Amino acid sequence: MKNLYKYIFAAMLTLTTATSCSDFLDESPKGVIDEDKAFSRPDEMVTSAYAMLGDCWYSYPFNLWPYGDLSSDDCLKGGSGTTDTGYHPMEIWSTMTSTSGEFDELWYRLYCAVSRCNRALLSLEQYGNTKLGEETCKQRIAEVKFLRAHFYFKLSTMIRQVPWIDENVVKNKLQEQTRNDEFTYEQLFDKIIADFKEAYDVLPEVQKDKNRANKIAAASYLAKCYLTLAYGDGYEATNGYDHINKEYMQKVVEYTNVVKNSPNYGYLEDYGDIFLPEEKNSKESIFAVQTSDYKNDNTTFGRANWSNVLNGVWGMWSCGWDFHKPSQDLVSAFKTKNGLPEFDDYNKTIDYPVNGKPNAQTWDPRLFHTVGMPTFPYKYEPEYTLTKANSRTPNTYGYYCSMKEVPQRSKGETYNGSWHAFAMNDYVIRYTDVMLMRAEALIETDNLAEARSIINDIRQRAKNSVDKHIAYAENQCDIALYPESYFQNKETARKCLRWERRLELAMENGRYFDLRRWGIASKTLNAYFANEQKDVYDGQTYATYLKDAHYTAGKNEFYPIPYNQLYYVPGLYKQNKNY
């Protein structure tokens, strides 16, 4: 694992410059290292492709938090106000346009990553067998195809119709002839699936370098692809559930079964441990973007998580800019009655816990691992108790803050540079996410009993996650397992599954994509906009700007193709519908 870190840093210092992005359609190494010399070292070209996993910045976060969380009912933008960064349209939708600089930069950087993968594949094709040996070369090709599929999954789930540019397109110099509508949505996913399938067929379950892609990561991603496709073309359906593809759901069951049966992955015993840096490569982590602390990795600066650099607590960190703020709607979703969610009544009253002052309202324990709240210790450390002063603009974004992506304050900042950041891995896929995908597919393939068993296993872990980290909230927590009566029909089982995904994966950057997959984004978000702007915390109103928010079905399911990309290749790309 240390060797892979070493090569990634070398790739950053050399190949990042050598293959700087001049144009995502035709990226060529130049500058620090001679092109032929760099290209003739296939294993380092592979490492340079891995380096792109973390080659992000707050204006183009590869974990997609502005596009998967901010755009949902789980969080508000945060910062100094609505004009702080260009992410405000993502939280109100009504002002979404193709001219966003953030859209354009993210598209550009993701295609730089695709280009890096294509360059590595061409290097492996030419030099791999002779320099690495046939078996190692075969594995490296599979790893790079996994990485390329990973980047394309992000592009296609965000923007839908994107140009497919692989190593053959590059080799034949067809980049400037490649349209974005050459393939349908499903055909594009077929290509992504083919890359993941090659990784699944070739790679071992365990790699010598722990951070490389492996068979289980590929199986997890294949399940995610088929789950996405099972619901149709990505736009909201109007015919109930008849459109759900049972064959694809069965594929989800099959691939998640591979993950379930692996002895190398499983649930961590305490939910809170998942989000501590010392557990970042635990059995819960199937694939993650790796980071490191400069004090421990023998580098000058370290490898920081730049996607989340804005999300620290105001007044607690030098990089605490107070972005990614949990919504009241999310906090209310953690309410319980007799240990079970208040599905229909959770948002009827505005409630929030106060440390040391329990009342009749009880909460799922995962709230206290997910949302930082005034009067409570921040991430389990009483010496760093949150106050109202730790919110930057409470009259706009309220008093809650996110906890999962930020380390405990006592750990300090872990990037040695003019900007400060954290060495917290970004989960791409974690074990519980895969098991919830499995439960979702089991419900749709009529195995409600096993789905209930999976969900109850996850709830049992949450029930057991009080004493170690959040004993101060013990008398405010209550969570129970679902009785059989909740899984007698698909309608109620779906409600339990969807609620569980929200609570378990809250603030992990995927809520919007769940809502879209289920075809309930417009109904859920427009109701949320109406309710959230009325919320009050201890007399303070906030989020009144949501009066201007509106989500339009048939348009907003996908983000627009950036205007600059349409301009650069006139007539080659078609805009998503209704933009």
Regions found by a protein language model. Give the residues of each.
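Long, intrinsically disordered, low-complexity segments
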Residues: 42, 75, 110-113, 185, ...
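Membrane-proximal, proline-rich intrinsically disordered regions
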Residues: 21-71, 562-579
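Glycine-rich, aromatic-lined ligand/substrate-binding cores of catalytic
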Residues: 283, 289-392
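Bacterial Sec-dependent N-terminal signal peptides
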Residues: 1-30
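Short coil/turn linking the two alpha-helices of tandem helical-hairpin repeats
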Residues: 156-157, 163, 207, 228-237, ...
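Conserved, well-structured interaction surfaces
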Residues: 39, 45-55, 81-159, 175-190, ...
